[in-house]
UniProtKB/Swiss-Prot annotation:
This is Phosphoglycerate kinase. Pathway: Carbohydrate degradation; glycolysis; pyruvate from D-glyceraldehyde 3-phosphate: step 2/5. InterPro entries: Phosphoglycerate_kinase (IPR001576), Phosphoglycerate_kinase_CS (IPR015911), Phosphoglycerate_kinase_N (IPR015824), Phosphoglycerate_kinase_sf (IPR036043). Keywords: ATP-binding, Cytoplasm, Glycolysis, Kinase, Nucleotide-binding, Transferase. It comes from Caldanaerobacter subterraneus subsp. tengcongensis (strain DSM 15242 / JCM 11007 / NBRC 100824 / MB4).
Length: 394
C-alpha cells in the first residue's frame, strides 16, 4: 500500500486521534445488536495502546442531524469497547468542547478516550475547516481507520488530515490491500455478482468491472431493466425506463469484451411485496403482466452457483431479491452459500450482502467482508476515496 500506516510512525507518548466507524445497530434499549464494526477497529486501537500512545477515538452514529440527541450517544459503544479491550474507556461528554479538551489533555499513555458522536455538529458533514482544526488540536497524529466513511469528505475523515500527520489504520490497510489486489491483479476466472434495486446506483461499478472480469452475474431489482432491454415483458417489476438504452449498451459492450454477462433465466413472482402473499416461479419469458419479480429462481441459482464455484476471485455487492422478506431471500442466501463454498478469493461488499453472509454464519468462510457499503462500491468503481487520498504517502 502506498499510504503510510500506524506502523510507519512513532506513536509512543503521542496523542493519537483515530477516526473509527462505530456506527453500529442498536435495539430500542440501546443494546448493540451487532458489534462487528467495533471488533474490526480493535487491531489498530490495541496496537496504539501497546505502543504507549494516548488514544482518542472519534466516530459518528446514525444521523442525528447536526445537533445533540441522547438517542445517538456513543455511551453504549464505550461500554462495549471497554468489555472488548478489557480496560476502561473514558467517555467525553462532547466532541470539541471543554470536557473533551480537559480529558484529552489529561490522558496517560495507553489510555483510551472516546469522544461523543461527531455528527452532533453540523460542521462535521460540511467539512468545516474551523471545526476540523479544533478537532485536530486535541492530538499530535491522525489515523483514519473508518473505511465505511472513507468515501465522504467530512471534517473527521478528511478535514483533520490537513492539520496533523495523517496515516491509515490496519482496517483501511486490509480493505485496500484485499480489494485492491482483486481489482488490480485478480486470479482468474474473476466473477462479479451485482444485485440491488437500481441500475443507476451500479452504472459506475458495471462500467469499471467490465474492463476486468470474466463473468458478470446480475440479480436484484436492477436485473429487470436489463431483461426489458432484451425485449422481454417484466410485468410490474422494478423498471428504470430511462436506463433501457444504457442497459443495451452495457450488454453490447460485455459482448465485445468477451465478458460472460448473465441475467436471470427464471424469477420468483408475487402480486405484492410483503410476507405471506402467494408466489410462484416462472421462466423469464413468461412474466404475467400483473406480477412483480421479487427474487431469482432455482434455475438461475443453479447457473450462478456453478460459475461462482469455479471462480478464483469473486466480488459480490447487492442482494438477489427482496432480502427483507424471508420468502424472497432464497436467491441471496443461495449466492451466499455458493460464495462460502468457493475456493478462490471471495469479497463481499457491505450492506445486505454482508448481512446475508453474517446471518447464515458464513463470515469465516469468505476471504473478506467489507465494512463499508458505499465506500466499497465507490472503490469498485475505481473512484478516489477522499478519506484515503488525503493520508500521507510512504
Amino acid at each position: 500500500m502506498k499510504k503510510k500506516t500506524v506502523r510507519d510512525i512513532d506513536v509512543s507518548g503521542k496523542r493519537v486521534l483515530v477516526r473509527v466507524d462505530f456506527n453500529v445497530p442498536m435495539d430500542e434499549n440501546k443494546n448493540i445488536t451487532d458489534d462487528r464494526r467495533i471488533r474490526e477497529a480493535l487491531p489498530t486501537i490495541e496496537y496504539l495502546i501497546n505502543h504507549n500512545a494516548k488514544v482518542i477515538l472519534v466516530s459518528h452514529l446514525g444521523r442525528p442531524k447536526g445537533k445533540f440527541n441522547p438517542d445517538y450517544s456513543l455511551k453504549p459503544v464505550a461500554k462495549r469497547l471497554s468489555e472488548l479491550l478489557k480496560k476502561p474507556v473514558i467517555m467525553a461528554e462532547d466532541v470539541i468542547g471543554e470536557d473533551a479538551k480537559v480529558k484529552a489533555a489529561a490522558l496517560k499513555e495507553g489510555e483510551v478516550l472516546l469522544l461523543e458522536n461527531v455528527r452532533f455538529h453540523a460542521e462535521e458533514e460540511k467539512n468545516d475547516p474551523e471545526f476540523a482544526k479544533e478537532l485536530a488540536s486535541l492530538a499530535d497524529i491522525y489515523v483514519n481507520d473508518a473505511f465505511g466513511t472513507a468515501h465522504r469528505a467530512h471534517a473527521s475523515t478528511a478535514g483533520v488530515a490537513k492539520y496533523l500527520p495523517a496515516v491509515a489504520g490496519f482496517l483501511i490497510e486490509k480493505e485496500l490491500s484485499i480489494m485492491g489486489e482483486a481489482l488490480e491483479n485478480p486470479k482468474r476466472p474473476f466473477v462479479a455478482i451485482l444485485g440491488g434495486a437500481k441500475v443507476s446506483d451500479k452504472i459506475g461499478v458495471i462500467t469499471n468491472l467490465l474492463e476486468k472480469v470474466d463473468s458478470l452475474l446480475i440479480g436484484g431489482g436492477m436485473a429487470y431493466t436489463f431483461i426489458k432491454a432484451k425485449g422481454y415483458e417484466i410485468g410490474k417489476s422494478l423498471l428504470e425506463e430511462d436506463k433501457i438504452e444504457l442497459a443495451k449498451e452495457i450488454m453490447e459492450k460485455a459482448k465485445q469484451k468477451g465478458v460472460n454477462f448473465m441475467l436471470p433465466v427464471d424469477t420468483v413472482i408475487a402480486k405484492e411485496l410483503k410476507s405471506g402473499v402467494p408466489y410462484e416461479v416462472v421462466d423469464i419469458d413468461k412474466m404475467p403482466e400483473d406480477q412483480i419479480g421479487v427474487d431469482i429462481g432455482p434455475k438461475t441459482i443453479e447457473e450462478y452457483s456453478k460459475v461462482i464455484k469455479h471462480a478464483m476471485t469473486v466480488v459480490w455487492n447487492g442482494p438477489m431479491g427482496v432480502f427483507e422478506i424471508p420468502e424472497f431471500a432464497k436467491g441471496t442466501k443461495a449466492i451466499a452459500k455458493a460464495l462460502s463454498e468457493c475456493k478462490g478469493t471471495t469479497i463481499v461488499g457491505g450492506g445486505d450482502s454482508a448481512a446475508a453472509i453474517e446471518q447464515l454464519g458464513y463470515a469465516d468462510k469468505v476471504t473478506h467482508i467489507s465494512t463499508g457499503g458505499g465506500a466499497s462500491l465507490e472503490f469498485l468503481e475505481g473512484k478516489v476515496l477522499p478519506g484515503i487520498d488525503i493520508l500521507n504517502d510512504k
